[in-house]
Swiss-Prot record:
Keywords, alphabetical: ATP-binding, Cytoplasm, DNA damage, DNA recombination, DNA repair, DNA-binding, Hydrolase, Nucleotide-binding
The protein, known as: Holliday junction branch migration complex subunit RuvB
Record-listed E.C. numbers: 3.6.4.-
Domain remarks: Has 3 domains, the large (RuvB-L) and small ATPase (RuvB-S) domains and the C-terminal head (RuvB-H) domain. The head domain binds DNA, while the ATPase domains jointly bind ATP, ADP or are empty depending on the state of the subunit in the translocation cycle. During a single DNA translocation step the structure of each domain remains the same, but their relative positions change.
Region spans: Large ATPase domain (RuvB-L): 1-185
GO terms, biological process: DNA recombination; DNA repair
Length: 350
């Protein structure tokens, strides 16, 4: 599999790099569409913290890329009326990197760490006491003369986001007072997001066009917004000031994105499972090697959506293509391959 997949408009893991795309992010909870349970909880917790004039308890956000974890971290800081310091776990390479940030935080501010599962053990250990006691242990000197100095920190809120909760250590998870899990968005929720983004981008599109685009957005707002901008390009070149359902479908066909939001690399993955491994079960590492991808890319990007829409199952023995996958590819379904739509590993996104 070639790595031009990283340029695909349906790859949700890449962070927005365009100021116009960042401008689509809502700034308040009332403007954040979807994730209703998480919003209800956060609204209550934020109000309680403000009423007590305290920092919000530490918040752990779990979910696939592109669902709004970073956006919600910024919204939380905005709703609290405090600053938000943002970093990624890979940037916290040495203890002094973390110490420099923690000691510069203002009272009740938000410290957002993306990809928190990638923290080094030494950095995690520093965070334990910082999160629990708002203090920082710092070692001065070396060898027998070394001593530990405890530095007081202002009360703050750590917001950690991850796509791989299983890689976060139990001691770190236990220090988060609030844990929220993000779910894929429904087509109706995504259609509302597309219509909001269209208004902000001064794009005219009808409800049917918004829903058609939403159905191909992998349950992910970041993908929906990216596709909206690409479809706008098609409409502009076609000389149309209005985006219709016909233009959406023509644009998606040109981008090689099918009605389920699958691109060529998704189709190739399913075909490799079926044609090379008899539909599975096949291990993640073996499948990743066959595709020329890393196991992490397979698990973080491809699997969640394919499992959610019922094209793949993850079992103790490995990954399996479902009967629905065979049908989607127009292949005969083996008699032994039965579809279990109510399996806990599968969802009902579409």
């Amino acid at each position: 599999m070639d790595h031009t997949a990283s340029l695909s408009p349906v790859r949700p893991e890449a962070q927005p790099t365009d100021d116009r795309e960042r401008a689509l992010r809502p700034r308040l909870l009332k403007d954040f569409l979807g994730q209703e349970k998480t919003k209800r909880n956060l609204r209550l917790f934020i109000q309680a913290a403000r009423d007590r004039n305290e920092s919000l308890d530490h918040l752990f956000l779990i979910g696939p890329p592109g669902l709004g974890k970073t956006t919600l971290a910024h919204i939380t800081a905005c709703e609290l009326g405090v600053e938000c310091k943002v970093t990624g776990a890979p940037a916290l390479d040495k203890p002094k990197d973390l110490a420099g940030i923690l000691t510069a935080l203002s009272e009740r501010s938000v410290f957002f760490v993306d990809e928190i599962h990638r923290l080094k053990p030494a950095i995690e250990e520093m965070l334990y006491i910082a999160m629990e006691d708002y203090e920082l242990d710092w070692v001065i000197g070396q060898g027998p003369s070394a001593r530990t100095v405890r530095i007081p920190l202002p009360p703050f809120t750590l917001i950690g986001a991850t796509t791989r909760a299983g890689m976060v250590s139990s001691p770190l998870i236990s220090r988060f007072g609030i844990v929220e899990r993000f779910e894929f968005y429904t087509p109706e929720e995504l259609a509302a997001i597309v219509q909001r983004s269209a208004r902000l981008l001064d794009i005219t599109l009808d409800a049917r066009a918004a829903l058609a685009l939403a159905r191909c957005s992998r349950g992910t707002p970041r993908v929906a917004n990216r596709l909206l901008r690409r479809i706008r390009d098609f409409a502009q070149v076609a000389g149309s000031a209005h985006i219709s359902e016909t233009i959406v479908r023509a644009g998606l066909a040109h981008l090689k994105i099918d009605e389920l939001g699958l691109e060529l690399h998704d189709i190739q993955l399913l075909r490799v499972m079926i044609e090379h491994f008899g539909g599975g079960p096949v291990g993640a590492e073996t499948l990743a090697i066959s595709l020329g991808e890393s196991p992490e890319t397979l698990e973080d990007y491809y699997e969640p959506y394919l499992i959610q829409i019922g094209l793949m199952q993850r079992t103790p023995r490995g990954r399996m293509a479902t009967a629905r996958a065979y049908a989607h590819l127009g292949l005969p379904v083996p008699e032994a391959r039965t579809l279990t739509p109510h399996s806990p590993e599968q969802g009902t996104l579409l």
